[in-house]
Amino acid sequence: EGECGGFWWKCGSGKPACCPKYVCSPKWGLCNFPMP
C-alpha cells in the first residue's frame, strides 16, 4: 500500500508507520520530526 503517517498523524499500535522523515513520538503518540 505504501501508506505512511504524515506530520502529526496518530501512530503506534494499529496505526500506519510514520513516513520516513518522521518518527513516532512516544510522548504524544504522533508522527513528528526526529528530536536530537
From Swiss-Prot:
Negative results: has no significant effects on Kv1.2/KCNA2, Kv1.3/KCNA3, Kv1.5/KCNA5, Kv3.2/KCNC2, Cav1.2/CACNA1C, Cav2.2/CACNA1B, Nav1.5/SCN5A, Nav1.7/SCN9A or Nav1.8/SCN10A channels. InterPro entries: Huwentoxin-1. The lineage of its organism: Eukaryota, Metazoa, Ecdysozoa, Arthropoda, Chelicerata. The presence of a 'disulfide through disulfide knot' structurally defines this protein as a knottin. Expressed by the venom gland. This is Kappa-theraphotoxin-Pg1a. Belongs to the neurotoxin 10 (Hwtx-1) family. 44 (Jztx-4) subfamily. Disulfide bonds join C4-C19, C11-C24, C18-C31. It is found in: Secreted. The keyword Secreted applies. Gating modifier of Kv2.1/KCNB1 (IC(50)=5.1 nM), Kv2.2/KCNB2 and Kv4.3/KCND3 channels (IC(50)=39 nM). Acts by shifting the channel activation to more depolarized potentials by stabilizing the resting conformation of the voltage sensor. It completely inhibits opening of the Kv2.1/KCNB1 channel at negative membrane voltages and dramatically shifts channel activation to positive voltages. May act by partitioning into lipid membranes and then by binding the voltage sensor paddle of the channel from a place within the membrane. GO terms for molecular function: ion channel inhibitor activity; potassium channel regulator activity; toxin activity.
